[in-house]
């Protein structure tokens, strides 16, 4: 009976531990509500009394505006890396922070320009906000599906009301609102095909509890490029990569948290409700006759798909369009069948798939590991397969989206070939 006694003791200890955790969580919540003193602050916008908002002190200006129905874009999720949540405080601006000094000129700082994700609301302020942000809106959507399309990338499909369509453009993005939540990564198997389990098990990623139940509302909203194009409304799509902690001995570092927004999205199931705001974006299509080259890697597939499908299926463009897409292996490739069909249906569309680390089964299926235009880093394959053969590379428009190293490699390569920065449309969320 000794082992039963030990099991009983462990069960009691676990129960006590859980109860203590709940009590401490309750104390924190109560303390925040009753002990942290806040006061009402007025935010006067564009010198228009009708736009004045009353908010509680202590929160960031970004979250205060969002909660007041003015969703300022913050693609990086409030980490001060994308530099897009700029607001001009024309009265009662606090001293600039280091993040502000790294973003704005001395003259701009004196004029009151600040990053709203870093600015705390402590008193009344007068703000100047661009009209396009005042016209942004929020929508509630229902998750249709949330399946893995690669080992660490999901395709989130959401249905919004057809009566209130989102007026977005291809290449645009929406912010996803993150509420307080708690999840366990083993539950994510419900929306993950078994073929992806082995890599998650190899890195010990299952059975990890991610507790953001005390998350301050609107403190971690993040923007994601749309993978859909407007003709697909009322359905919208995103490709979203999970932000895991760095690995130590094939396991996530327990000292570093998982990505707040990506973990929330990976926990979503069909039928769940989510809130998005926007639309935003600058990386739209330039309407001219210049030929197009898309250089896309990983979850940048969202950006590429939105533009390419709109050009071919909606606008019936006759422009020459080339897509170079880079993935590690065939298992990590996204939208291959869709692009291969487009290549058959449209003579002006050309699709090149490049694998950096093809698996043995990829080689067995016929993938040529010795062809440097197929097995390589994407920027090298692109140079060998197309760029070095162009007589006038500066005549093309280049749409670039992918991981930071992908983006920097492509930009350096194009610069080496004399391509002006104005001919490169980069979708980069400051990651």
UniProtKB/Swiss-Prot annotation:
GO terms for molecular function: 2 iron, 2 sulfur cluster binding; electron transfer activity; metal ion binding; oxidoreductase activity, acting on NAD(P)H, quinone or similar compound as acceptor. [2Fe-2S] cluster binds at residues 76, 82, 85, 117. Its main location: membrane. Residues 136-286 form the FAD-binding FR-type domain. Its EC number is 7.2.1.1. This is Na(+)-translocating NADH-quinone reductase subunit F. It catalyses: a ubiquinone + n Na(+)(in) + NADH + H(+) = a ubiquinol + n Na(+)(out) + NAD(+). Binds 1 [2Fe-2S] cluster. The chain crosses the membrane at residues 10-30. Its cofactor is [2Fe-2S] cluster; FAD. It comes from the Bacteria. Belongs to the NqrF family. GO terms for biological process: sodium ion transport. NQR complex catalyzes the reduction of ubiquinone-1 to ubiquinol by two successive reactions, coupled with the transport of Na(+) ions from the cytoplasm to the periplasm. The first step is catalyzed by NqrF, which accepts electrons from NADH and reduces ubiquinone-1 to ubisemiquinone by a one-electron transfer pathway. NCBIfam families: nqrF. HAMAP family: NqrF (MF_00430). GO terms for cellular component: plasma membrane. It is a single-pass membrane protein. Residues 41-133 form the 2Fe-2S ferredoxin-type domain. The lineage of its organism: Bacteria, Pseudomonadati, Chlamydiota, Chlamydiia, Chlamydiales. It comes from Chlamydia caviae (strain ATCC VR-813 / DSM 19441 / 03DC25 / GPIC) (Chlamydophila caviae). Composed of six subunits; NqrA, NqrB, NqrC, NqrD, NqrE and NqrF. Keywords: 2Fe-2S, Cell inner membrane, Cell membrane, FAD, Flavoprotein, Ion transport, Iron, Iron-sulfur, Membrane, Metal-binding, NAD, Sodium, Sodium transport, Translocase, Transmembrane, Transmembrane helix, Transport, Ubiquinone.
């Amino acid at each position: 009976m000794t082992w039963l006694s030990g099991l009983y003791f462990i069960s009691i200890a676990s129960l006590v531990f859980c109860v203590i955790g709940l009590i401490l969580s309750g104390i924190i919540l109560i303390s925040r509500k009753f002990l942290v003193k806040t006061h009402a602050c007025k935010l006067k916008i564009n010198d228009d009394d009708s736009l004045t908002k009353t908010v509680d002190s202590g929160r960031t200006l970004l979250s205060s505006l969002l909660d007041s129905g003015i969703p300022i874009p913050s693609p990086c999720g409030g980490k001060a890396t994308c530099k897009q949540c700029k607001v001009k405080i024309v009265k009662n601006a606090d001293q600039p922070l280091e993040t502000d000094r790294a973003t704005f000129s001395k003259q701009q700082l004196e004029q009151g320009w600040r990053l709203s994700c870093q600015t705390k609301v402590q008193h009344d302020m007068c703000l100047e906000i661009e009209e396009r942000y005042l016209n942004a809106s929020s929508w509630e959507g229902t998750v249709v599906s949330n399946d893995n399309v690669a080992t660490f990338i999901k395709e989130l499909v959401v249905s919004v009301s057809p009566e209130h369509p989102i007026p977005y453009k291809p290449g645009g993005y929406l912010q996803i609102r993150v509420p307080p939540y708690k999840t366990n990564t083993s539950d994510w198997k419900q929306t993950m095909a078994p073929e992806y389990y082995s890599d998650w098990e190899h890195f010990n990623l299952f059975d990890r509890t991610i507790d953001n139940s005390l998350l301050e509302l609107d403190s971690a909203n993040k923007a994601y490029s749309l993978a859909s194009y407007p003709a697909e409304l009322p359905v919208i799509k995103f490709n979203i990569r999970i932000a895991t902690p760095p690995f130590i001995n094939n396991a996530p570092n327990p000292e570093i948290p998982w990505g707040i927004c990506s973990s929330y999205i990976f926990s979503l199931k069909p039928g769940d409700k989510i809130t998005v705001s926007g639309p935003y974006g600058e990386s739209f299509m330039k309407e001219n006759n210049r030929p197009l080259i898309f250089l896309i890697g990983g979850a940048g597939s969202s950006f590429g798909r939105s533009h390419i499908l709109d050009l071919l299926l909606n606008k019936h463009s006759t422009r020459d369009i080339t897509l170079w897409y880079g993935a590690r292996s065939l298992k990590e490739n996204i939208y291959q069948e869709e692009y291969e069909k487009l290549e058959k249906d449209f003579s002006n569309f050309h699709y090149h798939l490049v694998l950096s680390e093809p698996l043995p089964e990829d080689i067995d299926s016929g993938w040529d590991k010795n062809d440097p235009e197929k097995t390589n880093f994407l920027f090298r394959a692109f140079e060998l397969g197309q760029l070095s053969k162009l007589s006038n590379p500066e005549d093309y428009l280049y749409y670039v989206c992918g991981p930071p190293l992908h983006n920097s490699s492509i930009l350096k390569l194009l610069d080496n070939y004399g391509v002006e920065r104005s001919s490169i449309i980069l979708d980069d969320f400051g990651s």
